[in-house]
């Protein structure tokens, strides 16, 4: 039988994490007792005479699962680590019918809430938003109920569509075929997965782009792919931009968390976007070694973009007065983009520097350059992401090329 990926943490665990994992194991043990009489199975699958439900795929996470009746399933979705943790509850599982019966799924989120509207797919590749009539959410958003009509074929149900390690590998391989782009393994994650970078030809100035520090933030990953596609295009603008700036991309910083269906952390129990300063985790350490190497080569950082997702699209930037220049790069860039897509809702959200050890604060405090967190709303239409990301990329390139 399959074993749960949820128990695959490695490395030394802090006492609080041991306690939390003990609680989760107790929940599973309790579910196992029920399973003996109900016919349900836990770990990364459960089943009845009506259907089999499993999460035995990259990005899968169903927490504790049991059939309370042959056609009713209860899920308890818990974070990978004890709070405090961002309450972005992730779930992703596959329902394989054995009989053609309607099924009700009830997801209870522990230390989290129903942040994401469920998406469904018959093949794990093409996704759509589940119809409103099939979903209900409790007033406090702690319980999500899904009613599925009779069906005979398997169905993936997920907080967001899957964008997993294999998808990144294929995408990065296609980008690495560009004559100006090289691929480099910077290091390994806690579970031994490669931390891959794409690097263009060396120039006096460098632009950094990062992604997927937080596993559930799919829309940020989609935006980054479309944005980067424009940077590597064959337009006069893109060619001029690459002729001046070296590009360093690390699109998948947390491959272990993505594979395990985590809410936030890597396998070390750390929010990687709070490790830019301590540099305690191998994923961030590997990137820091590359940054040090580029610094030692005398190449000047000019911009950092870090792609994420949140409830509403926004760009976290520095305050205009944080720079000596007359022109505020971020405002200029975003104003130009807005003129070309006035129908796309996003916020320019300048913030004062803080002590939070994230990518944005690290690059600003270290290099005094524009360092921007590029956030795309969770439920933004995917067609709008594909349409607007290249425009953001074009206007970024124009503004950067105008700067001294």
Please report, for each region that a protein language model flagged, where it lies by residue.
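N-terminal secretory signal peptides that target proteins for export/translocation
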Residues: 1-22
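Leucine-biased recognition of intrinsically disordered, low-complexity hydrophobic segments
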Residues: 13-14, 25-27, 42
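Sec-dependent signal peptide recognition
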Residues: 24-35
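N-terminal signal peptide c-region/cleavage motif recognized by signal peptidases
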Residues: 38-39
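Extreme N-terminal flexible tails
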Residues: 42-144, 151
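Extended acidic/polar, glycine-enriched regions
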Residues: 139-179
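Active-site-adjacent mobile loop/cap segments within catalytic or ligand-binding domains
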Residues: 162, 273, 315-323, 349, ...
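Active-site/substrate-binding loop(s) of hydrolase catalytic cores
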Residues: 180-196, 202-347, 369-378
